[in-house]
């Protein structure tokens, strides 16, 4: 490379094949064509800082690939600053290809690898009130990341070498750029140096460090601009900041995964960081002993699952009385009947044979069979033909229905000794160690009482659910037999009446509940009307605050005139809103939402 007193910077400032997301960044082709060629050079600044001009843009060119910019950096103070930065920056000194060392060029590629064009906002008219006309292009800036894609900057001390990296640029335009550069060098005198605002430059560099997915976006811009690999671009570099040491094994290189990159307030081209920090705000810390106590209480109070009873043939009426008197042989030996007083016989009953012998019907006394005035309503089998029926399993309660029998409590289980880190290791001085334990224990007790109440209500509902609210007689199965003492067509018996125990007195919360109407009656129409007035889920979901559908567009004022400019630098636009953090929920409310939802869904369902 031929050494030169200035550094050239070229690149696309707008690519039609990669349109930007923001409407204000779109450039009208007719407007751009009317503004070219430039009547005078445009200022070249750093990060759109008006008090940091470092050179001039001597031409903007419309090519088939997009709007192309060519500029030169002539500020002596800025070039000296680049030399100092290079010696202290490890990323600037890293190279993937064996290229000649260029401290200024390599420092620029590591610090300001993108171009940004500042143009007039499309909503602002170009004609002023006094009849003047505003220039559409205001200035071009070198920045850390542009808001338009494909705006990668290529620096170099040789203009021909810089233009060679853009394969989408027409040779005719490249030749025109070289001619304009020579003419601008002859016309321009000694460049004026302005003192650099170092504080602002450092602030912009800090903002650029929090751009989300900056390295990945720079790689994308490089691909859109179609720039080959033999350049000083740092977008694909992964610098090894550790000195090589053969004696010690070097650790693995730092990850460049976009998910691990930081983000910050860098304008519309980036989003603020902190997405992963909100993941732990919904968690609470519970001591291990408290958690194990809650888990044990849950297991102790959980009712056992009721296994379905094996299928058996239907039993004749009052067969349990015959099974109780069965001899010591046969399937019914040893069966125990329930306590008496559960059934009353208004007429007669048929007890059936005792041992399963068909001839036992003839040997039975006459009083063992009592005719009934009505014929049997159904036919279920022949008692005694296949032997006595299987024994009736024992029942609990005042009706023929199995109830839940809670398992014995594990009160004799050895309690774990409290650990030091659980009792006082995670607490600050003066903090009560039983604060969370009392809240959780009280909540667990309330949940257990509610579950027992719901189970009692469910058992009562299932007990009387087949006959409505009233205690109507329960009709049992009827049987016939064709033996000498069997039922004849003109004979019948009356169904035994079921006399249950009186129901328990209703509690306060049970009495307040409305009883369902008995079968055969029509529910009042007011219930249907009330259901029709229930709001839908979609309406309830939309009851929250609505977002503003017409947000005000941000405006950016020009640095030396009252124009509204559009700056295409991602790090030059600060976010107007800070990420809102959700309010922390109280401990009791959060615990209530966890345990109520988990325990009630598993037990009551």
Swiss-Prot record:
Taxonomy, superkingdom: Viruses
Sequence segments annotated as region (Interaction with pAP): 281-300
Enzyme nomenclature, EC number: 3.4.21.97
Active site: 48, 116, 139
Pfam families: Peptidase_S21
GO biological process, one term: viral release from host cell
EC main group: hydrolase
Site (Cleavage): 235-236, 568-569
Sequence motif Nuclear localization signal, residues: 410-416
Start and end residues of each stretch annotated as Disordered: 235-274, 403-431, 489-588
Single annotated GO MF: identical protein binding
The keyword Hydrolase appears for this protein: yes
One GO CC annotation: host cell nucleus
Keywords (A to Z) from UniProt: Host cytoplasm, Host nucleus, Hydrolase, Phosphoprotein, Protease, Serine protease, Viral capsid assembly, Viral release from host cell
Family under the similarity heading: Belongs to the herpesviridae capsid scaffolding protein family.
Notes on the domains: Region of interaction between pPR and pAP is called Amino conserved domain (ACD). The region of interaction with major capsid protein is called carboxyl conserved domain (CCD).
Protein name as it appears in the record: Capsid scaffolding protein
